[in-house]
Amino acid sequence: MIYMFLANGFEEVEALAPLDLLRRAGCEVTTVGVGGGDMIVGAHGIAVGADIPDTMFRDSKPEMIILPGGMP
């Protein structure tokens, strides 16, 4: 499983372009919202619904973790 962690202020292109490409390639990617709330808002105002909140992240051996950049 691949996990992409998203927090408010994430850089949208750094998150959404890889997310789209990985899912088109058939990879199982789960977005994890950091900091609570159902919607995570990027640096340029684009709101994204995370698949799970960070409190539900329990995978001790993920295949990959993606941490997009951004400004809080």
Question: Which residues does each predicted region cover?
Answer:
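Extended, subdomain-level signal for the structured scaffold at the beginning of enzyme domains
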Residues: M1-P72
